Amino acid sequence: MAKEKVLTEQDSLRIIQEMIQKAKAGAHYERGQGPILWGSVIGFAGIMSFLEIYFKWNIPFDWWILTLVALIPQVFIVLNDRKKNIVKTHEARAIDMVWAVFGISIFALVLYGNFIGQITIQLLAEEDITLWKRSGTDGSLASFQMFVPSIASLYLMIYGFPTLVTGVVIRCRSMLIGACICYILFVVSLYTPTVWDMLFIGIAGICNWLIPGIILRRQYLLSVKTKHV
């Protein structure tokens, strides 16, 4: 029977430190990749939507389609983590689940915003109820299309949740500040029209993800550089 190797105290500490470093390197949000990606996309789409509505530009393109395009590099980020066989702590797994629930919630909100108006009209029609609006000029009546008021406010509220949790767990002050900005913008958006809500979403993407992502990326690259010195 082969003699088992006895680990010294120094060997044990070295192994523990290596495991911690692998766990830290495995979280794409700690490397800043995910936050930079989504902060850039949400920030750009929100600001461009605001400019298009405010200045009445006629651009035949939905800026929010960019969020679907961003799923492609996000998949590559996740697959790259798996290929490296990176060790994940319980905290990292919990944060991953928080972001997964966040993604599901955003998808549910998109469905809600796109379908609830028409579905409400159909349900009212089944009860023989029709909505009309009266013209302010000649007093004529026209059918009224149900809409969802200030759904952008709900996005702002949800945006802050995963960032706040992540910021608390990894002790990232910039994420905590970004999440607080999201909740402040949520409250302000309750009193503003949709055009300004689009601007708030763009600002939220920049403050909530892009800026913290850049800070995390710089810290990660500095730690890698220090490690190899």
Region roles according to the model:
Residues Y159-V229:
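Terminal transmembrane helical module of multi-pass membrane proteins
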Residues E30-Q122:
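Selected alpha-helical membrane-embedding segments in polytopic membrane proteins
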Residues A94-S105, L124-R134, V188-P193, L210-L221:
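Alpha-helical membrane-embedding segments
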Residues I104-M175:
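Membrane-proximal helix-loop-helix units in multi-pass membrane proteins
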Residues F55-W63, F144-F147, T192-F200:
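Membrane-helix interface and helix-disruption motif detector
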Residues W63-A70, Y155-L156, F200-N208:
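Hydrophobic core segments of alpha-helical transmembrane domains in multi-pass membrane proteins
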Residues K22, V75-E91, F161-V168, L210-R217:
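C-terminal ends of transmembrane helices
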Residues M1-G32:
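N-terminal juxtamembrane cytosolic/stromal segments of multi-pass membrane proteins
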